[in-house]
């Protein structure tokens, strides 16, 4: 088995068929599609069973609701492919994408993580495309800083060597799980490659956590950013490094406004938070 495609499913009956049709047209040999029904209550699980019927490459796992991370981890436990990738059940993958990516991986067998281009917020006024360079990065840290990877820590527009997840799991009970997990994978001294080939189509969702984040979610995002900066040995003094720290400062202001908590222990942060509060 070459590629395991893991698709968590939770109450997405309106988009699931569109998503799965984009996967089934990929025409990749040695591919399995793992549908992880995370306790859906809208008939999504039944639709998954229906679409998997008569399709040998596709299988369905029904489980109690545990959240996105738990569903992805369940898929990883079932996966048999040399490589794994994730697709959210309201998104699509452009035709020919997986064939192009697997061909590239076969020509570069030392690549551990292959990231490909993504159309962000498809169907929304903020829609744009992130077209990645065709490049093999000298180190994960160089990739992280020079590509400003914290701006595109999507789990879904990447193909991973499955063995990377032997000691890494997605964090159950947390939101912004991609920002938590991707730096941990990168910290394993991996070989990263980016490509302009293929396209992941990430649809805008008005109910997503990135749109409706509350104080708890903002706190978890800031914690994930702080952890990423530590794992990737980011320097606040570098030009690109400062961009991440600036984002962390903005998140700290959000967290302080919503919860009153100060997580960043920089000497000037408490003063900035108080000034921000007094200027509201």
Describe each region flagged by the PLM:
Residues 154, 203-280:
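C-terminal subregions of glycosyltransferases and related glycan-biosynthesis enzymes
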């Amino acid at each position: 088995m070459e590629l395991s495609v893991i698709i968590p499913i939770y109450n997405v009956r309106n988009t699931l068929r569109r998503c799965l049709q984009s996967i089934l047209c990929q025409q990749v040999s040695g591919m399995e599609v793992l549908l992880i029904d995370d306790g859906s209550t809208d008939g999504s699980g039944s639709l998954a069973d229906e679409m998997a019927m008569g399709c040998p490459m596709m299988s369905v796992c029904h489980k109690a609701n545990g959240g996105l991370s738990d569903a992805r981890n369940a898929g990883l436990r079932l996966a048999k492919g040399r490589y794994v990738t994730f697709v959210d059940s309201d998104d699509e993958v452009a035709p020919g994408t997986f064939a192009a990516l697997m061909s590239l991986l076969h020509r570069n067998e030392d690549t551990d993580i292959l990231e490909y281009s993504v159309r962000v917020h498809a169907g929304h006024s903020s829609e744009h495309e992130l077209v990645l360079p065709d490049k093999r990065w000298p180190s994960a840290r160089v990739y992280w800083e020079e590509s400003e990877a914290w701006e595109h820590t999507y789990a879904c527009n990447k193909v991973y060597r499955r063995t990377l997840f032997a000691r890494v799991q997605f964090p159950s009970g947390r939101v912004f799980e991609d920002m938590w997990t991707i730096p941990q994978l990168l910290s394993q001294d991996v070989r990263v490659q980016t490509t302009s080939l293929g396209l992941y189509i990430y649809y805008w969702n008005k109910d997503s956590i990135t749109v409706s984040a509350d104080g708890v979610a903002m706190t978890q995002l800031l914690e994930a950013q702080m952890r990423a900066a530590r794992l990737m040995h980011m320097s606040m003094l570098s030009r690109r490094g400062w961009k991440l720290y600036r984002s962390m400062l903005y998140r700290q202001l959000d967290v302080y406004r919503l919860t009153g908590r100060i997580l960043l222990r920089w000497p000037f942060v408490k003063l900035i938070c108080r000034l921000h509060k007094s200027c509201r």
